[in-house]
Regions:
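Residue-level marker for buried hydrophobic side chains located in beta-strands
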Residues: 5, 34-36, 65-66, 143, ...
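Acidic, His/Gly-enriched loop-helix segments that form or flank divalent-metal centers
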Residues: 107-230, 236-240
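N-terminal active-site segment of His-dependent metallophosphoesterases
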Residues: 1-53
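A general structural motif
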Residues: 29-31, 60-62, 140, 189-191
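Conserved beta-strand scaffold positions in the cores of enzyme catalytic domains, especially
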Residues: 43, 65, 194, 229-233, ...
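Short, glycine/acidic-enriched loop or turn micro-motifs at the edges of active sites
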Residues: 10-11, 42, 71-72, 149, ...
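Divalent metal-coordination and catalytic microenvironments
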Residues: 8, 39, 68-69, 97, ...
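Active-site neighborhood of divalent metal-dependent phosphoester bond hydrolases
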Residues: 43-135
Length: 249
């Protein structure tokens, strides 16, 4: 099977579609699927178009959805926080995503926050897309996840491998979605190459390959390849790019 892997689109549908076109996803006549490594929305302004695209791929059984930390934030916004416009929901872009998907007026959303939350719960994103998301997906040689697989973070900022990560509970997966895979991979001992997103790849190129800076003119947002890891988050809001990895396995 051929897999087209994309991560952290964050609502930049046009850039995502361009990356898929360049990789040959739409013209591919062989068996293939799209793998989305989470963080679908919360930056760009094309949430509705992207939502429709995902629903179409789901209907055709051509997409595998991995849950990211921003999906967790959306659920938190519309359930625990009842649609309240807390500052971190705004700074993370989650509040704006809910506004886009519901069509709510920003002023009315802040006043009628319970109605706003109910409207967000009635979106296909909340009712259909998020419930279809997996913590991870694996093939013979690869495991696909958002941040990293559940591990034990140590005080020195290293990570200790957990052999039973597949049996991890909800809390462990929620935590792992926030991990920087490029740091976690330095101590991981898994037999599969882990393909992840969440953290901008310029970090790995800069810190571990000593190539360019994280956010300067010389920053490299291409996929990062290291022992046991392929990281693909291009930090689209900053770079304007979306990485598309093509894997056959």
């Amino acid at each position: 099977m051929r897999y087209y892997v994309i991560s952290d689109v964050h609502g930049y549908y046009t850039q995502m579609k361009s990356a898929l076109e360049k990789a040959g996803f739409f013209s591919d006549t062989t068996p293939h699927k799209l793998i989305m490594l989470g963080d679908l929305f919360d930056r760009g302004h094309e949430a509705k178009q992207f939502q429709q695209f995902i629903l179409e791929q789901m209907e055709q059984d051509k997409i595998i959805l991995i849950r990211g930390n921003h999906e967790d934030l959306f659920v938190e916004l519309v359930t625990t926080d009842a649609g309240m416009p807390y500052s971190y929901h705004k700074s993370n872009g989650t509040y704006d995503t809910a506004l886009q998907l519901t069509g709510f007026d920003p002023v009315m959303a802040s006043i009628r926050h319970y109605d706003f939350a109910d409207a967000a719960k009635d979106t296909p994103f909340y009712k259909e897309i998020i419930p279809a998301m997996l913590d991870y997906f694996e093939t013979e040689h690869y495991a696909f996840t958002h941040g990293w697989i559940p591990s034990i973070p140590n005080r020195d900022k290293s990570y200790s491998y957990i052999s039973s990560w597949r049996e991890a509970d909800r809390e462990q997966w929620n935590q792992a979605r926030w991990f920087n895979g490029m740091d976690a991979a330095q101590t991981a001992d898994e037999n599969k190459t882990i393909v992840c997103g969440h953290w901008h790849t310029s970090y790995g190129h800069s810190k571990y390959e000593h190539k360019g800076s994280e956010f300067g003119e010389d920053a490299d947002f291409s996929p990062y390849y290291g022992p046991g890891i392929i990281a693909i988050d291009a930090c689209t809001a900053f770079s304007g790019k979306v990485n598309c990895l093509v894997i056959e396995d």
